[in-house]
């Protein structure tokens, strides 16, 4: 924040929703935590809603540790934004295109944002491309203005034909191979495999939704910030790639994953965690 905060002034932050004392080992959306959405209302009372342009949120926090929203949380955020005429923007760079078994997290949670940011899965990350989807009301507001202009927000490589071709081909594969449904069908298999690791050495929490999961470690033995990278290294040496960040692992298998591959992932994690003392 010291380095980047001054570059983006006028931004307030909601508290994240993870609380291991109240929601550890939740499968899917935690039961506890809906009240945390009302922190947005408190911020708006302090700042005056008329000064707030938009609320930007990841429906599921991805690289920050797979923080799954409590039941009703996103619905409440939508309700507050609508009440105060504030735009709701979903960052679906990670959750979009099948990761949660649906085209978008907005579909999974039945919450309609005003804008969706997307990338990664748009081209299967084979070539850089991102996009923003707008609600028609925003588009129409611009195009029917007294002096209409285009929805101008372009860069040097906007609409790059190679990236667009990759995106179209990727969308075809999603449809032809029914990958969103495969992710949906594999979710309970993935969930069971991950939560079978509960009770292992220094495991503080396991959480999951769709084909996203995280294992959080405590420092009851060696420091968690040393434990997580050692688990990563052990898995890597056994040809299973997970991601570590400080004191947790993120597991996010590809949309084509099958039960035998999920079993291999959980076996590698079990062996790695059990080997460290």
Annotated model-derived regions:
Residues 1-277:
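Conserved N-terminal phosphate-binding loop of PLP-dependent enzymes in the Aspartate aminotransferase
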